[in-house]
Amino acid sequence: QVAGRAGRAETPGRVVVQTYEPDHYAIQLAAKQDYRAFYTRESAFRRACLYPPFTVIARIVFTADAEKDARAAAEAAEEKLNAYIDGAGIRRDIVQMRALEAPIRFLRNRWRWQVFLKMYFKADQEAVTRKMRDVAAETAEGVQAEMEVNPVNMI
């Protein structure tokens, strides 16, 4: 996108990319403007790693002044979601689900824990994410919850 905006009319633009991984396939293929090869390679990687668009990732991030409160909220949410998943008979469609510390545990003077869920498309995604929203809304006083589906950033 940057390269497309770099030039003006007939004048070609020039783009400089700074990276720690100049040999990475994304950089190499972008430099060659080989979008088809990039798509093929990235799709294969995403399928192998069970990343979107081949699965759905959803998470609830819990934040609180005390770490124990954020952790307790995440663990309680995990327990409720496990009960829902088992009751709905969709355990086989869930790739992974667990409560864990957020990648950045402490941000803006608040502790962060999350419930991370990855599911195949066979699962009733709308029902599962609706249940996640309900669980997020049931947090204890002093705990905030934010739910995301296929987040752009997992931090």
Where are these regions (language model features)?
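Accessory helical-bundle/CTD segments and flexible terminal tails appended to RecA-like ATPase motors
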Residues: 1-155
